[in-house]
Regions:
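Catalytic cores of alpha/beta
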Residues: 1-8, 41-49, 66, 73, ...
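C-terminal helical cap(s) of enzyme catalytic domains, especially alpha/beta-barrels
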Residues: 26-31, 112-138
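C-terminal output/effector regions of signal-responsive regulators
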Residues: 76-77, 91-92, 123
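Generic secondary-structure signature for well-ordered alpha-helical cores
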Residues: 73-77, 96-99, 127, 131-138
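Glycine-rich phosphate-binding active-site loops on the catalytic face of alpha/beta enzymes
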Residues: 16-22, 55-65, 99-121
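Catalytic beta/alpha-barrel core
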Residues: 2-3, 9-18, 32-43, 52-60
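Aromatic/hydrophobic pocket-lining residues that form π-stacking "cages" and hydrophobic walls in ligand
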Residues: 22, 26, 42, 68
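Glycine-enriched alpha-helix->loop->beta-strand junction motifs that scaffold or abut catalytic
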Residues: 7-13, 27-34, 48-53, 74-78, ...
């Protein structure tokens, strides 16, 4: 299972949790991997595996930006990519924190938009998100 995405041609892997077997496999294959973390123990494990960037998930439910700032303080070399509860109203505050490389947000690509074939709306929401990000990080 851990090699299915790579065999299908995935150029990078982002996961909701930290599975050491998946991380090690990706490192062996030279595939960038960003596993999900939600607490300092997860970050410790990521560091042990040689990672410098982790996903923080579910961001808002796990304490949001305040939790990321708390975790970033002792782990000065770690960068974060929060997802889960990120939206057009809060993305700027996340992106303003320098330890955050990027944010993910499903508000841009909702399942019902895909189901209904509303791809123009998806493009517009994605462009909106890009402009929001550019306003913080030109």
């Amino acid at each position: 299972m851990r090699n299915a995405a790579v065999k299908a041609g995935a150029k990078f892997i982002v996961s909701p949790g930290l599975n050491p077997k998946v991380v090690k496999y990706c490192i062996e294959k030279g595939v960038p991997v960003t596993p999900g973390t939600a607490n300092p123990s997860d970050v410790e494990q990521a560091i042990e595996l040689g990672l410098e960037v982790v996903k923080f998930f579910p961001a808002e439910a796990a304490g949001g930006l305040n939790m990321i700032k708390s975790m970033a303080a002792p782990y000065t070399n770690m960068k974060f990519m929060p997802t889960g509860g990120i939206n057009a109203k809060n993305i700027n505050s996340y992106l303003a924190f320098p330890k955050i490389l990027a944010c993910g947000g499903s508000w841009m690509v909702k399942a019902d938009l895909i189901k209904n074939g509303e791809f123009e709306k998806i493009c517009n929401l994605t462009k909106e998100a890009k402009e929001l990000a550019k306003s913080i990080r030109p």
